[in-house]
Amino acid sequence: MSRCGHLDATVTEHRIGGAPAFMRGLRALFVTDVHILPNTTQAELDALVERIAAASPRLLLLGGDYSDFPKDCERFFRALGRLDFPLGAYGVLGNNDAEAWEGHLKLLRKTMSQAGCKLLVNASVDIPLAGGRLRVGGVDEYRYGNVHMNQRWSDVHFGNLYRILLSHYPVLPEDRPDLMLCGHTHGGQFNLLGLTPYALGFERFGKPHRASAAISGLHDIGGMKLLVSKGIGASRLQLRVGVRPEINLLLFD
């Protein structure tokens, strides 16, 4: 049993095999479901940011659910803004962000931008690398949003292209990337001998044929790699049983 504390998050390494030559050696960090709360201390926030920095990522990817409270979301991004990521920082919305910032998405976008992080809502960016390019896309969240990726995302006529898709929910896209990064599930949050609320039908994602059965870990689905992170916090019940908070270090080889 562990509380959802930002001091408790471990760094889980994942080797992403089969990457093209221009992606090999890249260190990227995926952080999701941070859930900063009013009672999250500055020491906890600083410890989390230091852990992110210690992983030495060139690229930071964020999976949403930063906080239920705009002021605490701003605290998180102010702290994150102290760090520098050579290839940039990109994030998507979670359902809690959509609720907290309803009608004020421009302010969230500005808050993230001031920290050097770009919010992707059904959009993508291309990052040039030596010998190829990395495309990072992000979809709107599924509960309140309208998911439809832009045409640029699907344009794969460039040579030497690797695509990473950020989605808060583990709902499989029709146009599948090389790697998909998701959160939301908190790894089940309660795991008793392999039994989680999701195994009991707690929540369903989208159309059945597109919903991933995975609630945590790295998986291969028809050639697409899918990582569902356990994330760090929780929005209401601040407790985890059998599920350790994590941030995810991606090592491409």
Predicted features, each with a name:
Residues 15-17, 126-128, 218-220, 249-253:
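Short, well-ordered beta-strand micro-motif
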Residues 101, 106-117, 129-171, 240-241:
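Binuclear metal-dependent hydrolase catalytic cores centered on His/Asp/Glu-rich metal-binding motifs
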Residues 25-35, 133-142, 164-168, 225-231:
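Active-site-proximal beta-strand elements of phosphoester/diester hydrolases
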Residues 31-32, 59-65, 88-95, 120-123, ...:
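Active-site neighborhood of phospho(di)ester-bond hydrolases with catalytic His/Asp-centered motifs
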Residues 66-69, 95-99, 125-127, 141-144, ...:
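Solvent-exposed loop/turn segments at secondary-structure junctions
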Residues 1-22:
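N-terminal membrane-anchoring alpha-helices
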Residues 22-118:
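Membrane-embedded segments
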